[in-house]
Amino acid sequence: MSSSATSTQAFSLKTRQPIPDEDALLTEEDRILKQATKGEDCTTRRRACKNCVCGRAELERKLEAEGKLEAEALAMPPGGCGNCSKGDAFRCANCPFLGQPAFDATEDGKVKLNLTDDV
């Protein structure tokens, strides 16, 4: 090292700043526990879940018994984006095929599995 190039220390381990109190950083609004709220109607699916706890399954059964809810209305229609057959990475948020594997679009949404050996 040459005498003209001197290294200077940009920080010092001896000058420690006090650690701020974590409780002082929170406001009263942050301390209030927020209750998770569930939507009034489950709009993420076209039908009620198998283990429905929100009451939508009972409502659908009641409407179906009264004849106000048609069986076709409960059937899963094809999505509007046109990417339903490609897989979850390409599907829209309200796609009725979310969570299902990719399929051949010419077979009306039937999943065709490859059952051949890889070896």
Curated annotation (Swiss-Prot):
Q: What GO cellular-component annotations does this UniProt entry give?
A: mitochondrial intermembrane space
Provide the residue span(s) of the region labelled Disordered: 1-21, 33-119
* UniProt-annotated binding residues for [4Fe-4S] cluster: 81, 84, 92, 95
* Positions of the UniProt region annotated as Fe-S binding site A: 42-54
Provide one Gene Ontology biological process annotation.
iron-sulfur cluster assembly
Localization annotation? Cytoplasm; Mitochondrion intermembrane space
Output the Gene Ontology terms for molecular function. 2 iron, 2 sulfur cluster binding; 4 iron, 4 sulfur cluster binding; metal ion binding
InterPro entries, per the entry: Anamorsin, CIAPIN1
Q: Give the residue ranges of motif Cx2C motif 1.
A: 81-84
Residue spans of biased composition, Polar residues class: 1-15
Q: Where is this motif: Cx2C motif 2?
A: 92-95
Q: Which coenzyme or cofactor does it need?
A: [2Fe-2S] cluster; [4Fe-4S] cluster
Annotated residues for binding of [2Fe-2S] cluster: 42, 49, 52, 54
The UniProt family comment states: Belongs to the anamorsin family.
Entry note about domains:
The C-terminal domain binds 2 Fe-S clusters but is otherwise mostly in an intrinsically disordered conformation. The twin Cx2C motifs are involved in the recognition by the mitochondrial MIA40-ERV1 disulfide relay system. The formation of 2 disulfide bonds in the Cx2C motifs through dithiol/disulfide exchange reactions effectively traps the protein in the mitochondrial intermembrane space.
Subunit structure as annotated in this protein's UniProt entry: Monomer.
What is the protein's known function? Component of the cytosolic iron-sulfur (Fe-S) protein assembly (CIA) machinery. Required for the maturation of extramitochondrial Fe-S proteins. Part of an electron transfer chain functioning in an early step of cytosolic Fe-S biogenesis, facilitating the de novo assembly of a [4Fe-4S] cluster on the cytosolic Fe-S scaffold complex. Electrons are transferred from NADPH via a FAD- and FMN-containing diflavin oxidoreductase.
Protein name listed in UniProt: Anamorsin homolog
What's the source species for this entry?
Answer: Leishmania infantum
